[in-house]
Amino acid sequence: MNNSQSLYLLWATILNQSQSAEQVLLNTVELFNRLGLNEEFNEKYKKLDYRKIENAMTQKPCLHRFPKNMSINLAGSIYMIDKYYDGTPSKLFEEYDEPQEFKEKLMQFRGIGEHKAETAITIFQTYKKINNNRNLFRNKCGGLYKTIEKEMKILDEFGEDKDYDR
């Protein structure tokens, strides 16, 4: 997964609280649009900070029921990526090895608990064709079963980008 796809999946996971799964997908894409990440990811990502994220989240219509708290979580994810993944979002997913270990990595991000981490892993595994068992979605998360096809399309749309270092 490239940097855009990696950050999208991480942020969609963080934002997946107090709103429907369908709304999370729409709002995460809209957040990328508001921040300019869908067009000039590498340049815009370098300049992200809490203030820019909060402004994008609180612009009408707000992108979450709790936009300021989510802005803190999203900005925190940028700082975690800087500190532990050399400022490169894709490194979080490149280092995927064993599901339990990866779940623990995801749970270090503010706003991601066990269920959200498992959901992100399921989406990642599906996208990378590591696991195509659709019954898993029904058992783990009914919302995911409804949205997995949309999620795959969004990840495809974020497509390939060049190597990136913050």
Predicted regions and their residues:
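C-terminal accessory module of base-excision DNA glycosylases/AP lyases that mediates lesion recognition
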Residues: M1-S4, S71, A75, Y96-L106, ...
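Structural motif
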Residues: M1-L9, Q19-E22, L63-N69, K162
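A general alpha-helix detector
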Residues: L9-I14, N27-L31, E101-K105
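Alpha-helical ds-nucleic-acid-binding substructure associated with the helix-hairpin-helix region
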Residues: L37-Q108
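Short, hydrophobic/amphipathic alpha-helical patches that form generic packing surfaces
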Residues: Y8-Q19, A75-Y79, I123, R166
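Short helix-capping/linker segments at secondary-structure and domain boundaries
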Residues: Q17-N27, I81-P89, Y127-N131
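Short alpha-helical "patches" and their helix-cap loops
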Residues: Q23-N38, G87-Q100, R134-G143
